[in-house]
A protein has these predicted regions:
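N-terminal cap/lid segment of alpha/beta-hydrolase-fold proteins
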Residues: 45-89
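Gly/Ser-rich "nucleophile elbow"/oxyanion-hole loop immediately N-terminal to the catalytic nucleophile
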Residues: 83-90, 134-182
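Catalytic nucleophile-loop/oxyanion-hole region of alpha/beta-hydrolase
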Residues: 101-107, 111, 129-147
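Short amphipathic alpha-helix adjacent to the substrate-entry channel of hydrolases
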Residues: 106-124
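Short glycine-enriched nucleophile-adjacent loop
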Residues: 181-190
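The feature captures the conserved acid-bearing segment of alpha/beta-hydrolase catalytic domains
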Residues: 194-273
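Alpha/beta-hydrolase-fold serine-hydrolase catalytic core, especially in secreted/extracellular enzymes
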Residues: 256, 265-268, 273-326
Length: 326
């Protein structure tokens, strides 16, 4: 654009040059001006997109869904006002993988926006959904979750970033729904991750692997041994096609604290309901406990008198290690 401006100024300066016919000069100026307009329009269309979802969520920090030019093929959910966050009040991170390995969180944006409104930085795999149209395009990859973590850490260290020194890079949750849950389990060994949240998902066994959709990551059950953090499975009960896989995972995990929360709503969960429905309530409690150390949120899960079992329809199972969580 600057080069075009220089050419334009040059053309105007020499508009009266007798060696160049006036008609030809006008044509040159017209061409340059048209090129400037096209370039300007292209620049405007390249501006990162953003969208306010459900008035910013119900949390104390009204959220925004947006693109970041520094992270292609990802969608960011974050508080609109970052000025309240600093070294003493940081944003824990949630990196998210989508159902069907879609390269857009179009099915989960209400759920993710709600989480962000409680003071979390959510980095979802895929293109921003500017409406409710389904995504049609190539599948996402497991690497995009790693890119999300890399980006969050880099932003926290970059003095030119609006997130500079505002991100809690020591508290990172990896999560995903269905195929996104498989992506999360594929990445579970990453030492930067401090908790896992596996939603409507679970690893396939050899005998039912034929039910998997082509392109899904298919780590073996032995992958569960690489989990090094507390993990929650949030499932849709027996109507959920991932119920057996998820519960089988849960029963195999005995080396780290693990729990399985079930609400019999099926594989689709409640993500599309206002503010993400019941699944967002449980997910938020887990993240507030695991990433923010919120003892009140821990009551949703801890003890025989946990609050989750008092919510209509929910059941909660915990392994032996779970009681050691503080």
């Amino acid at each position: 654009m600057q080069i075009l401006n220089l050419f334009y100024n040059f053309a105007v300066k020499f508009d009266l040059n007798e060696n160049i016919p006036n008609k030809a000069m006008k044509k040159i100026i017209s061409i340059i001006f048209s090129a400037m307009m096209v370039t300007s329009l292209m620049a405007q269309s390249a501006e990162p997109k953003q969208r306010i979802v459900e008035d910013g969520g119900t949390g104390p920090y009204k959220a925004i869904m947006k693109e970041e030019a520094s992270l292609a093929e990802h969608t960011i959910f974050a508080p609109q006002d970052l000025s309240v966050f600093n070294a003493k009040n940081r944003l824990p991170v949630l990196v998210w993988g989508n159902g069907a390995c879609n390269n857009s969180p179009f099915e989960h944006y209400k759920f993710l926006n709600e989480i962000a409104s409680y003071g979390f930085l959510v980095v979802a795999t895929g293109f921003i959904p500017m409406n409710d149209d389904p995504y049609h395009g190539p599948m996402s990859t497991t690497q995009q979750q790693i890119e999300s973590i890399d980006w969050a850490i880099a932003q926290n260290s970059d003095p030119d970033s609006p997130y500079y020194n505002k991100i809690d890079v020591k508290h990172i949750a990896a999560a995903g729904m269905s195929c996104g849950g498989l992506q999360t389990l594929f990445n579970c060994a990453d030492k930067r991750i401090t908790t896992l949240m596996i939603c409507n998902s679970g690893l396939f066994k050899i005998e039912n692997a034929h039910n998997a959709v082509g392109g899904m990551p298919m780590p073996p059950k032995e992958k569960l041994n690489e989990i090094h953090t507390p993990v929650i499975y949030i499932l849709g009960g027996k109507p959920d096609i991932a119920y057996e896989n998820g519960m089988d995972d849960f029963h195999r995990i005995n080396h780290v604290p693990a729990c399985a929360a079930n609400l019999p709503v099926g594989h689709g969960g409640t993500y599309g309901q206002p503010h993400g429905g019941e699944f967002s309530v449980v997910a938020l409690a887990w993240l507030q406990w695991q990433l923010k150390g919120d003892k009140k949120a821990a009551l949703m899960f801890k003890g025989d008198d946990n609050l989750l079992q008092k919510r209509e329809g929910w059941t909660l199972e915990k392994n032996e290690k779970f009681s050691k969580l503080k």
